[in-house]
């Protein structure tokens, strides 16, 4: 049985087997609490902390985020505006243009891979830092093999007398760009 990529290195982070076990148990407990399927509620982008329009996903994106307790994840987000989603089909048809497909690709993202808690930083059931990866699948080729760092905050609230869980995911995108995504747990 091959070691889970997200778990490799725990012993290197600690000097004691007891500490290593505590780190693993804590990370495992957090992954278990985060496990589920989430629907995208909204996104926002900033550059150098100044709000900017989200040029990638548009003004009304849809998406799904899946975290498993065993340490895997999948994320998909796409724009919904017709200008960003030409009516192409899968498998592609001969009359569909590369330009139409490029537009779809430019305004969507999909990736999957291991999921881990960054144990080098404080983390608990409500906030910390996740590592999406190293990614094994991505529609953007340069993302394969790379880990995406994501800060998380879990918010539980009541809506219509039902407990609802939201996860806010923050990501640094380089060049002063930052994204914040809100996800609602649906399963």
What is each PLM-predicted segment?
Residues 1-24:
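Fungal secretory targeting signals
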Residues 17-110, 117-187:
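Lipid interaction determinants
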């Amino acid at each position: 049985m091959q070691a889970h990529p997200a778990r490799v290195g725990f012993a290197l982070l600690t000097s004691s087997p007891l500490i290593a076990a505590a780190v693993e148990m804590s990370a495992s407990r957090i992954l278990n609490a985060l496990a589920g399927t989430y629907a995208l509620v909204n996104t926002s982008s900033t550059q150098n902390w100044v709000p900017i329009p989200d040029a990638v996903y548009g003004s009304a994106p849809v998406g799904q985020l899946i975290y498993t307790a065993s340490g895997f994840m999948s994320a998909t987000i796409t724009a919904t505006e017709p200008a960003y989603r030409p009516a192409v089909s899968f498998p592609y048809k001969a009359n569909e243009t590369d330009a139409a497909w490029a537009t779809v690709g430019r305004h969507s993202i999909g990736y999957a891979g291991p999921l881990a808690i960054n144990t080098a930083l404080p983390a608990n059931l409500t906030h910390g830092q996740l590592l999406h990866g190293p990614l094994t699948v991505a529609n953007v080729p340069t993302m394969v093999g790379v880990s995406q760092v994501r800060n998380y905050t879990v918010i539980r609230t009541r809506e219509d007398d039902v407990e609802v869980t939201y996860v806010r995911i923050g990501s640094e995108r380089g060049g002063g760009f930052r994204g914040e995504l809100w996800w609602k747990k649906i399963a």
